[in-house]
Amino acid sequence: MTDTSTNPAERVGPAFSVDGMLLARQKTQQAIRDISGKIVPGMLEEDAVAMAKQVLLDSGLGLSWHPTRVRFGSNTTKPMKVNSDPGIVLQENDIFFLDIAPRFNAWEGDAGQTFTVGNNALYQQCALDAERLFHEVRGVWEKEQLTGRELYEFARVTAESMGWRLNLDLPGHRISDFPHAAIYRGDLAEFEACPSPMRWILEIHILDPEGRFGAFFEDMLLDASCYSRSHMPDADVT
C-alpha cells in the first residue's frame, strides 16, 4: 500500500508511516480482543473501563488520543460525546461495545467492536449487522469511488433496509500520526471527495428503532487485502 493522497484535508504529519499505521492498527485490534475476553456478566461498566485502561497500559499502549470507552446495555445507544448512565451492570443476556484509540509510538490507532453475552438473537444480529454494514460501505467505496458524504448516505439507507437506524452523530474522522486533529478536524460524512486509504476511520453505529440498544463497529478505510475474510461477516468485500 502506497501513500498517494494529495487532498489538503488528507495531509499527514512528519512521522506518518504506512507500516507504522498498520502496526498501530494491529496492536489496537489485539487490545480489543484482549479486553473483550475479560468482560463477563455481573461486571459494572465503570469497572470494565478501568480494566480496559489497564489492559492497554500492560500492552504498551498507555497513551490514548480519545477516552477509552466501554458501553453496556442501554448505554450502547449513546453517542460517544455523551457520557454513559452510571451504574450499568452487564446482564446474562446483553450487548456491549468497545471504542479504544491508543497511540503506538507516533501513530494513532482506533478500533471499535460490539459483542454479546448469552443468547439474545436480536442483540447478536445487531452486532453482526454493524460489522457487515461497515464492510458493505467499505466495499462500495472501493468499487464506486464514492465521496464521504455519499458513503454515509449509502450507510443510512442500507441500515434502514436491515431494520436499524444509523446514528449520524458518529460521522467518521481522520487518522494519521498524532495528532491528526492538528491537521484536519472535519467529518468523513461531510467530505466531498473520495476518501483515500489509511486516512479515515469509518464509524458505523446502528440503533434499535425503539432506542433500546445499539451496536458499533469502526476501522480504518483500507483496501480489501487488509481484511481477513475469515473474520468478515457475509458481505461483498471486494
List the model feature ranges, each with a label:
Residues 1-238:
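Active-site neighborhoods and metal-handling regions in enzymes and metal-associated proteins
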